[in-house]
């Protein structure tokens, strides 16, 4: 199904939950395409078939029954995977092994590891003269948020001033950061890598210059990074 919508679907997803969301998106696109074809054929039948059947008396009870059953079936086909995704997301929020507090500022992010005393830092976008070879422009930061893979992480998102949004498209993650409100979600990352995102809520003049860089690494490497950062 994903191959059919290649080029029109979401980005390549790097987590199990994001893959489910990608599949659900493609599944809904397939349903939408089927409904579009069916309605087009039905309109063609009503327009051109009227000339043939206008002199005959026709009972539409069976047609009315079908028009009631088909939408119900389509809604059920959407409801079952939607509830499954909602249930899976609820299971992710039941328990966590590490808590990271993310605070949005104009125009940078602050990270605080609540379970590791003293581990907190600010994350600013790197300027052009600070970039190393291979680092993406307008996306790389001076301090990445580093987390271990295969670990359930609870993120607590808030803001110190205006509304921001902590968003990582390749992970299907987007949560608003609002002052005075602590929004939480849990997530598990099955693969290592560096994932980039940006603030997705217009927050002022430099809104486009507060990127997000999330580095997922092995647990041993994460422990070494923690010790090195706190020294």
UniProtKB/Swiss-Prot annotation:
Q: Which cofactor does it need?
A: Cu cation
Q: Which residues lie on this side of the membrane: Mitochondrial matrix?
A: 53-69
* Chief site of localization: mitochondrion
Example GO CC term: the record gives: mitochondrial inner membrane
- What's the EC number here? 7.1.1.9
Carries keyword Translocase?
yes
InterPro entries named among the record's database cross-references: CcO_II, CcO_II-like_C, CcO_II_C, Copper_CuA, Cupredoxin, Cyt_c_oxidase_su2_TM_dom, Cyt_c_oxidase_su2_TM_sf
Amino acids binding Mg(2+): 201
What reaction does this enzyme carry out catalytically?
4 Fe(II)-[cytochrome c] + O2 + 8 H(+)(in) = 4 Fe(III)-[cytochrome c] + 2 H2O + 4 H(+)(out)
Q: Where does Cu cation A1 bind?
A: 164, 199, 203, 210
The record lists the membrane-crossing segments as 31-52, 70-89
Regarding the membrane, this protein is recorded as: Multi-pass membrane protein
Q: What is the effect of changing residue 216 to M?
A: In strain: AB1 and KR314
Question: What is the UniProt remark on how the cofactor binds and its stoichiometry?
Answer: Binds a dinuclear copper A center per subunit.
GO BP: any one term: ATP synthesis coupled electron transport
Single GO molecular function: copper ion binding
Q: Which keywords, in A-to-Z order, does the entry hold? A: Copper, Electron transport, Magnesium, Membrane, Metal-binding, Mitochondrion, Mitochondrion inner membrane, Respiratory chain, Translocase, Transmembrane, Transmembrane helix, Transport
Q: Where is the protein found, in the record's own terms?
A: Mitochondrion inner membrane
Task: Write out the similarity annotation.
Answer: Belongs to the cytochrome c oxidase subunit 2 family.
User: What does the protein in this record do?
Assistant: Component of the cytochrome c oxidase, the last enzyme in the mitochondrial electron transport chain which drives oxidative phosphorylation. The respiratory chain contains 3 multisubunit complexes succinate dehydrogenase (complex II, CII), ubiquinol-cytochrome c oxidoreductase (cytochrome b-c1 complex, complex III, CIII) and cytochrome c oxidase (complex IV, CIV), that cooperate to transfer electrons derived from NADH and succinate to molecular oxygen, creating an electrochemical gradient over the inner membrane that drives transmembrane transport and the ATP synthase.
Subunit arrangement? Component of the cytochrome c oxidase (complex IV, CIV), a multisubunit enzyme composed of a catalytic core of 3 subunits and several supernumerary subunits. The complex exists as a monomer or a dimer and forms supercomplexes (SCs) in the inner mitochondrial membrane with ubiquinol-cytochrome c oxidoreductase (cytochrome b-c1 complex, complex III, CIII).
Q: What is this protein called?
A: Cytochrome c oxidase subunit 2
| Species | Caenorhabditis elegans
Q: Which gene encodes it?
A: ctc-2
């Amino acid at each position: 199904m994903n191959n059919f919508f290649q080029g029109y679907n979401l980005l390549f997803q790097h987590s199990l939950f994001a893959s489910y969301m990608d599949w659900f998106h493609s599944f809904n696109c397939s349903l939408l395409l089927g409904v579009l074809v069916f309605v087009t054929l039905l309109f063609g039948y009503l327009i051109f078939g009227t000339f043939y059947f206008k002199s005959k008396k026709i009972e539409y009870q069976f047609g009315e029954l079908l028009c009631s059953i088909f939408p119900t079936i389509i809604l059920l086909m959407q409801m079952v995977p939607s509830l499954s995704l909602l249930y899976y997301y609820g299971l992710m929020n039941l328990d966590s092994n590490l808590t990271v507090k993310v605070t949005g500022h104009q125009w940078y992010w602050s990270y605080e590891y609540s379970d590791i005393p003293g581990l907190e830092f600010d994350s600013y976008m790197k300027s052009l003269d600070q970039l190393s070879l291979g680092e993406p422009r307008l996306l790389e930061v001076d301090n990445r948020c580093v987390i271990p893979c295969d670990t359930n992480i609870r993120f607590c998102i808030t803001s110190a001033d205006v509304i921001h949004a902590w968003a990582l498209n390749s992970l299907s993650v987007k949560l608003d950061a609002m002052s005075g409100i602590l929004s939480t979600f849990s997530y598990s990352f099955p693969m290592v890598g560096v994932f980039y995102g940006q603030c997705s809520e217009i927050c002022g003049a430099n809104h486009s210059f507060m990127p997000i860089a999330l580095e997922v690494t092995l647990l041993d490497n994460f422990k070494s990074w923690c010790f090195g950062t706190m020294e």
